[in-house]
Amino acid sequence: MTAAQRERAALVATMSEIGPDSPTLCEGWTTRDLAAHLVVRERRLDAAPGIAIPLLAGYTDKVQRRTAASTDWDELVDKISSGPPLLSPFKLFDAVANMDEMFIHHEDVRRAQPGWEPRSLDAETIAALRRPVGMMARLTMGKVPARVTLQTPEGETVAVVGSGPGLTVTGDIGELTLFVAGRDEARLTFSDAQAAQAVRAARRGL
């Protein structure tokens, strides 16, 4: 199994354990809503573009709500577990397109629960998450009012984005991934608390 496939399996296990009505970090979404989002993304090519294109978002939201309401919970989870259908572009590019998606949404489920702790990630998962961080950071934080350096606790610079006063954000790769994706529930240290607040307010979520 690839790192993306293992993360998918872990997400499915967590969703199965906590059920369809638990909160997530995605504002207004329960685990059922999040599961429907993942199913629509991979299986409804007519509706998936609205996830990224605001002009089409209304139709996507309608399809997602219908999917959440009309599909049995176990069926939703099974569809996530089985992965993209044969003709889906996500099937061909699963390792690239789904690693971050599965990790971020798994943590959206985990970290909405009280008492969460970061998971210990294996080397393959860390490497798979590390590759797209820079591209994601440019997408979500390119216009933040600070020159942000993302670095690991070992001092490795992962990405530098934005312009303005310097801000160093330090954390493990998984935590940096979540921060870049717009999540505040991440274990990080910031060199400047005021700049960090401004960056949080200005970044785009995924």
Where are these regions (language model features)?
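Structured surface interface patches that mediate subunit assembly and partner/cofactor docking
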Residues: 3, 18, 44-59, 75, ...
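C-terminal end-helix/capping segment
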Residues: 55-71
